[in-house]
Amino acid sequence: RFSIQVDGQPNHAGTTPMKLRQDALVAASRIVLAVETMAIQHPGDPVATVGRLEVWPNAANVVPGSVALTVDLRDVNSVVLDQLVAELMQQVERIGAETGCPIQLEPQFEVEPTAAADGVMAAIVSAAEDLGLSHSHLPSRASHDAQEIGRRWPMGMIFVPSRGGLSHSAKEFTS
């Protein structure tokens, strides 16, 4: 996960010509779109999320002077994750140069993907079959306690479907 700080030049929205602006929100918006495009176009099935965006001074009549945002990149393969991080850094550098907005990118933390143990997963599949339950393999890019446990001991997880596939939502429901 990364914190990104985009600095522009706050200025009057009505009197500052477009070609003279250093709009931090425009630069941040380009980062948001670049993050989405990276994940969609990258081979495999990585995910990328901009989950927080803070605009300053956050006023309708002022060209935004700074924006703070977070970027969360995830994949089950650490090589793919490293490629995404390198691509993010390139995109941020390019966008900063094109918009004239200085951009600082700071790593907040890095979590290596942890694979479930084959033996544990086989036991889960066997138990589901014995009970006549359907099952499928679902790689998880979420950070669970199991991720840390799996670094020391054999680990596996059981997921049950929520209605509509929703998670981390007030509408999440599982029965």
Model region roles, listed by residue range:
Residues 1-8, 126, 156-159:
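Acidic-glycine-rich active-site phosphate/pyrophosphate-binding loop
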Residues 135-175:
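Zn-dependent metallopeptidase/amidohydrolase metal-coordination segment
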Residues 37-50, 95-106, 132-139:
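Flexible, glycine/charged-enriched surface loops at secondary-structure junctions
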Residues 19-42, 85, 90, 160-175:
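His/Asp/Glu-rich mid-to-C-terminal helical/loop segments that flank catalytic regions of hydrolases
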Residues 1-79:
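Midchain, well-structured core segments that form catalytic/ion-binding scaffolds
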Residues 80-84:
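Solvent-exposed, non-transmembrane alpha-helical starts
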Residues 49-58, 69-77, 102-121, 141, ...:
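A short beta-alpha structural unit
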Residues 113-131, 156:
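Short, low-order "capping/linker" segments at domain edges
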